[in-house]
């Protein structure tokens, strides 16, 4: 297929047009008074969203060069969301402003490479000032404030996220699901839970709830399949002498072994339950090891030279309470050494940092949470499917942003942090590097201006007023007042501001230093020919009518 090439100003102007269109669609969602965007779906009802990245993801332009510009900035919005959970609109607004200012200067003759160098230096200096101005997230109240702002000022969502984090800790897993009704709920599972239920309903101790509960129990862990009773008989006799319940976690328990366990349970000889080991393959081995470390036990594996026949009571794990239903097993109050658990947690964190697979990362984070204290499930309620999707997106964003705040700290929100940081930056640059520096200094005012415009105020006037002051002084777009942002709880995670600025500068630099674009020429499809009408029979005899 033939390709078309665009050069220099012609290419950059078309790229800018794509960035402008994306920016104009996304910018309206910014701030507490941001507007909704209605998105047509290929089937079903249109979706309504105030989430910048959801809007950006839907945008495809007909002009191939303009579309390339839009796609590059869209990628920046997505990357910002992935890394920080929020700040997609901030990144888009910054990228547009930097590109617009830069394009004007490059068209006037500035050297793009020198301009880029100045932009990079300015961004780095601003980020350093942001870090100095940040403060660590203190208590539950600040977590609630961050989550509320990221959920588009929904205080109920902010409170749910803060409650969830308080219950499971900053390393705990918090998942978001759809509720059955219209109310939002929070469910917390304490201890380690895995998705394997009892192998026989005859192990049940509570017939009403259909659960098996074992208190102060031993746990036998093995990666073997148990089919013969003689494999575990010596160990059973030893545990019976101790008079404690026993949970067996094995690859499988079948045949004679399972039958004998059930019969002895029913007769009251043994207080016992059995479940299959969680996971598959290598992940199963790692999860068994996690349970062993949490409970102070040892996985009985032939790979380690251990056999069930020769196993001692010292190899068994211990837990204060174990609850098993038909689908899940929950181990609470494992008696493992806290130092061993900390070492295992550190090991899993290292694996999370080094893995490139999203699936592996998710599974490792689940394991980390189970070792760290529990899993919280936020159940989002809504009256309609459209509202449910929009609300679920907001909760996901707020959750990620809150984790970012706990990780790196917080700065004042409402677009004021960038302006305050820039006020403290004074770089002695020359020529076109200085042009790049000044481009960034002007562009960082854009987020605050846009928040004010969306709330119905004059962006320029608001920016000027904020620039006149220092410290935590900023603009509350919810009520149009100038306030102490920290006292009002208007805060942003440092990580969100940092990544938004870094990504915006990165993509703008790429666009400004682009000298040519190559794209396919769309071939015009010829209109299909009219079908052959054939001879119009019978017309020949009309001569006789004369």
From Swiss-Prot:
GO cellular-component term (any): cytoplasm
Pfam families on file: Cpn60_TCP1
Domain of life: Bacteria
Cellular location(s): Cytoplasm
Example GO molecular function: isomerase activity
GO BP term, example: protein refolding
Catalysed transformations (reactions): ATP + H2O + a folded polypeptide = ADP + phosphate + an unfolded polypeptide
Keywords: ATP-binding, Chaperone, Cytoplasm, Isomerase, Nucleotide-binding
Enzyme class: isomerase
Binding site for ATP: 29-32, 50, 86-90, 414, 492
Keyword Isomerase attributed: yes
Record PROSITE patterns: CHAPERONINS_CPN60 (PS00296)
EC number(s) stated in the UniProt entry for this protein: 5.6.1.7
Chief localisation class: cytoplasm
InterPro entries the UniProt entry points to: Chaperonin_Cpn60_CS (IPR018370), Cpn60/GroEL (IPR001844), Cpn60/GroEL/TCP-1 (IPR002423), GroEL-like_apical_dom_sf (IPR027409), GROEL-like_equatorial_sf (IPR027413), TCP-1-like_intermed_sf (IPR027410)
UniProt-listed Gene3D superfamilies: GroEL, GroEL-like equatorial domain, TCP-1-like chaperonin intermediate domain
Subunit annotation: Forms a cylinder of 14 subunits composed of two heptameric rings stacked back-to-back. Interacts with the co-chaperonin GroES.
Biological role stated in the UniProt entry: Together with its co-chaperonin GroES, plays an essential role in assisting protein folding. The GroEL-GroES system forms a nano-cage that allows encapsulation of the non-native substrate proteins and provides a physical environment optimized to promote and accelerate protein folding.
UniProt similarity note: Belongs to the chaperonin (HSP60) family.
Protein name per the record: Chaperonin GroEL
Organism: Helicobacter pylori (strain HPAG1)
């Amino acid at each position: 297929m033939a390709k078309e090439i665009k050069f220099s100003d012609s290419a950059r102007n078309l790229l800018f047009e794509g960035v402008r269109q994306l920016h104009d669609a996304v910018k309206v969602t910014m701030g507490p008074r941001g507007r909704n965007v209605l998105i047509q779906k290929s089937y079903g009802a249109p979706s309504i969203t105030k989430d910048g990245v959801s809007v950006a993801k839907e945008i495809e332009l007909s002009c191939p060069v303009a579309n390339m510009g839009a796609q590059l900035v869209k990628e920046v919005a997505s990357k910002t969301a992935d890394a920080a959970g929020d700040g997609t609109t901030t990144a888009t607004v910054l990228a547009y402003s930097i590109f617009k200012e830069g394009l004007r200067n490059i068209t006037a003759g500035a050297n793009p490479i020198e301009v880029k160098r100045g932009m990079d230096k300015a961004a780095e200096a601003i980020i350093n000032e942001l870090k100095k101005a940040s403060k660590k997230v203190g208590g539950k109240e600040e977590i609630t404030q961050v989550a509320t702002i990221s959920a588009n000022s929904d205080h109920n969502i902010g409170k749910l996220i803060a409650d969830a984090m308080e219950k499971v800790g900053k390393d705990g897993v918090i998942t978001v699901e759809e509720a059955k009704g219209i109310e939002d709920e929070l469910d917390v599972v304490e201890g380690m839970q895995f998705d394997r239920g009892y192998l026989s309903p005859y192990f049940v101790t509570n017939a009403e709830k259909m659960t098996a509960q074992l208190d102060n129990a031993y746990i036998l862990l093995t990666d073997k399949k148990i089919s013969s009773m003689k494999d575990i008989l010596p160990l059973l006799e030893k545990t019976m002498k101790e008079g404690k319940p026993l949970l067996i976690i094995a690859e499988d328990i079948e045949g004679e072994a399972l039958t004998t366990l059930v019969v002895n349970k029913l007769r009251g000889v043994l207080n016992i339950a059995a479940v299959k080991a969680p996971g598959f393959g290598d992940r199963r081995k790692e999860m068994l090891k996690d349970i062993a470390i949490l409970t102070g036990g040892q996985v009985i594996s032939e790979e380690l030279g251990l056999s069930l026949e020769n196993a001692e009571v010292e190899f068994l794990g211990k837990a204060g309470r174990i609850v098993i239903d038909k689908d899940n097993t929950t181990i609470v109050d494992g008696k493992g050494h806290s130092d061993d658990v900390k070492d295992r947690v550190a090991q899993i964190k290292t694996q999370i940092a080094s893995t490139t697979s999203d699936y592996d990362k998710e599974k490792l984070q689940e394991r980390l949470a189970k070792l760290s204290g529990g899993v919280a499930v936020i159940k989002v309620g809504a009256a309609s499917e459209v509202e449910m999707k929009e609300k679920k997106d907001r909760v996901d964003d707020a959750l990620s942003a809150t984790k970012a705040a706990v990780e790196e700290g917080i700065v004042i929100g409402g677009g004021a942090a960038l302006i305050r940081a820039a006020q403290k930056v004074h770089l002695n640059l020359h020529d076109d590097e200085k042009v790049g520096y000044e481009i960034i200094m002007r562009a960082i005012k854009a987020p605050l201006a846009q928040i004010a415009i969306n709330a119905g105020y004059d962006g320029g006037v608001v920016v000027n007023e904020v620039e006149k002051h220092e410290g935590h002084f900023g603009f509350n777009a919810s009520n149009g007042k100038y306030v102490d942002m920290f006292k009002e709880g208007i805060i942003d995670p440092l990580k969100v501001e940092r990544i938004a600025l870094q990504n915006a500068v990165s993509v703008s630099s790429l666009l400004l230093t682009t000298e040519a674009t190559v794209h396919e020429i769309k071939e015009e499809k010829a209109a299909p020919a009219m079908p052959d009408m054939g001879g119009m029979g019978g017309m020949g005899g009309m001569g006789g009518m004369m």
